[in-house]
Amino acid sequence: MAEQKAKVVHGPGPRGMGGPRPKVENPGKLLKRIMAEVFQHYLPHCILVLICIVVSALANVQASLFLQTLIDDYIIPMTQQQDPSFAPLAGALVRVGCIYVVGILAAWLNARIMVNVTQGTLRNLRTQLFTHMESLPISYFDTHPHGDIMSVYTNDVDTLRQMLSQSIPQLVSSAITIVSVFASMCMLSWQLTIVTMLMVALMLFCSKKITQQSGKYFIAQQRDLGKVNGYIEEMMEGQKVVKVFTHEQKALEGFRELNDKLKDSAKQANSFANIMMPVNAQLGNISYAICALVGAAMAVTGMGGVTLGTVMAFLSLNKSFNMPISQVSMQANSIIMALAGAERIFKMMDEPSETDEGYVTLINAKYDKDDNLVEANERTGIWAWKHPHHDGTTTYHKLEGDITFTDVDFGYVPGKTVLHDINLYGRPGQKIAFVGSTGAGKTTITNLINRFYDIQDGKIRYDGINIHKIRKADLRRSLGIVLQDTHLFTGTVMENIRYGRLEATDEECIAAARLANADGFIKRLPDGYNTMLTNDGANLSQGQRQLLAIARAAVADPPVLILDEATSSIDTRTEALVQRGMDGLMYGRTSFVIAHRLSTVRNADCIVVLEQGRIIERGSHDELIAKKGKYYQLYTGNLAEN
């Protein structure tokens, strides 16, 4: 947009290695909100998962405890028999095998259910995100990098997938395992349990220190990744500009700078995270060795009633106890990273939606036998404003296309006004042209008509109705807009034209294309109106894309047109074709036109000259030329340049 706007804000990123690190705000609140999303739709599934986790954990504990019985009651007595019978031992092994099978089945069922819960939750979150995104005001997209928004849908949502499918189930499983194993160890030998707990305390201390360091960098990594994605998208969209100005090296330098920051934060995060498992594993081995040594001494001396079977069962439990503690430490980093992603997700979801206090609606209308406007259920070609009043009555006013600005002031950011005391009107069927230097405020005025932004002072009336009273969807439905930057969607040519009015028939779309003089080039495409367009219509010329945008506006058949730089990017021959089509389209409609080529607005009913957000001249082409003011300078300069 040519006008002054709020500066694009890139989210706060991590500072240098010695500076303060970003932190997740209210991690407990974030986790509670995530789980609320899960429980809202999958509470029965989560209960079943919890049961499976408990069964699996208890099966593992029971299998470890069975070692004591196996050794003390079966194996040792068999060694003392001259002709031992293996039948009792085989029966015992079958029983322990059944325990393991139950644990495996519970773990398998748990994994299957969690896949369903995780993917369903992420689907719901993405749907909520997209639904909310569609309700956000244009100002949000003007002030947030699009790549950063995309990163929320991809990277941040993916970190939640890891947390929901792996980290949280693992934490729950570890917690249940730790409690059950601890109780079993105490039952076997409280002395050996004390030895184990001393080593566990050391493991927890080391894990806490490592997690504190890695957590800072995981958050920084997530935010740096968003910046890299934003930069890549920006360079992809502007690749032609980069090549035209031969700034490939400059673009590469910018990417390397961001990529190096991502590498540094990721390296630091993973360096700390990757040493956690080896450290805990070695501490676990030390704990195992100490317990084996102490247990053997106790078994030999008969201290505390410890037997060889007790020692073997306890050592198995010792491994089962140390493993979940290591897993908890490892999953802590994943959860911190996921919470950083969740913070960005919920921050976007908590952005205030576009407000709409309007209550006047646009309806299909017809005249009854008394020549009064009444509401119609079918499309009649007559539009009317349905205006309910405080006294309970409702009036209908035919949509004419009369737009008036009265003492309008506006600024994109508080304290910085870009439009000052704007007074203008567009009567039904008139063509109003805005001209002026770049940044004068031309496009800003059109943004106010469709309420992409709201004014700070003054009034804008549409058919005598304050536009703040008109529901935004109905206001915009009455406007046909050809934006400065033409955007085409993935789909056929016909579908892109029909986007202007989704219920339009093929015949109406073709008629709109003919009106815009696009029918000729469309028929020359490989599949005509069924030709697929991808990548924003990259297989079409700029002029052809502009013609399709005009056809899209034409099929909506609006009473008011806003043409923002509609022909500024089209060659002279194509412009002549477009101009003839546009003249037909604008006939009988209120039209607001912005164009760099002043020759395209010579036949305007009124030309408004803007400079630094103020109207400095207005009148017809001949009147303004006779004044020899700003318009004269622009016009003669334009002619000389051409």
Positions of predicted regions on the chain:
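Helix-loop-helix
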Residues: 77, 184-198, 268, 272-343, ...
